[in-house]
Amino acid sequence: MLSRMKFDIDDIVTKKLDALPKTIWTSKTTRFLDPAIGGGQYVRAIEQRLRDAGHSTANIRSRVFGYEQSSLYIRFAVNKYNLVGQYVEMPYDEFFELDTTNMKKFDVVVGNPPYQTHTDNNSRAIWPAFVQKAVELATPDGYVALIHPSGWRNVRGKYDIIKDLYTTKTLNYLSIHNVQDGRKTFGASTRYDVCIAQNTDSTSKHRTAVRFEDNVTQQVNLKKLPFIPNCNLKDVMKVVAKVGEVPVEVLHSESAYVPRAKWVSKIKSNNPLIYGVRTLSKHSEPVLLWSSRNDRGHFGIPKLIWSESGDILSAGSIVDAEGKYGLTQFAYAIVDTPKNLPLIKKAFDSKEFRNIMLGCTAGTMIINHKIIATFRKDFWKDFV
């Protein structure tokens, strides 16, 4: 979650509001909602713009709304900025369950809602629920303009519902920001996306203005991409398998040789020594576990192995031409012929390939096996 009590109007707020149609400020009826007002940055800026456009206090009060689960936040923001809109205390989970069937919808739903919530030493992502509810609360043709994490841009996974939403609705603008931007803007070591979508069905040819993290802006048809990289779109898409091309075979399992399994141990035993790669050091030295079973896959398969240890630039790799290693859930492998594996390793360890993977990270700084699985089988030829 980004800063919830930051009271200056950030440049990012100004830019996001600037990207909305100018007519929403001159209109006397446009309705606004911030689903989690926090310190009031957005509603403050909205009220000020409406006031600058000549609207009365009564008019502004009738159409600027906000929710926040902390009454302290609401009182502080209202008193500090003399806010006149209608701001209601509501727990996030209650907001997510709002029955919007008979609710009057909003022309603009905008804000920077919290990323996650913490309960009983556990945390869960709540930003997807904010995105879904924001679209539900927007009028037909209305706008949803939110800041949230970048996980939805990854290959198919737990945020598919957000990816499907943004590619079926009209996503007009996407601004991708790296960890350095997160520290600078919010004082948080997290990457984030700024998304501005219109609540209309997108056409098959719709192109989104994507501002990549290297400040390059391109018009992109997101429907044609298996994932959305952070930068270097042209170079990344060169190695992605096209229709009809054979993709890379990636080997991975969350359960075959997990360290907690009864047949896996850190201690050598009288059983045949069957290796399970747990992690690799930056010098490509395997940290091994021992398994009393070899019937759960991986063994006997020639492959190039890497793991989650180290970041994208420092992670090691090893050639397992004989297929003597199994993989824990922390390790991954590219399957190929023993002849090709040394060349694949050369490509995999190259600076050029690692830079491609840097451009594909959606969260943690590890080499993303889901992304590699979208590459064409002979991708390595581009790097050797």
Please place each PLM-identified region on the residue numbering.
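C-terminal substrate-recognition regions of SAM-dependent nucleic acid methyltransferases
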Residues: S3, K104, Q180-V384
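Signature of N6-adenine DNA methyltransferases within the class I
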Residues: K6-I12, A36-R44, L50-R51, H55-R63, ...
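S-adenosyl-L-methionine
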Residues: M1-K28, Y42
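Eukaryotic short linear interaction motifs
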Residues: K16, L72-I74, L313-S314
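Flexible, charged surface loops at secondary-structure boundaries
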Residues: W25-S27, T57-N59, T101-K104, R296-G300
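Conserved acidic residues
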Residues: T30, D107, K303
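Conserved class I S-adenosyl-L-methionine
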Residues: K28-G38
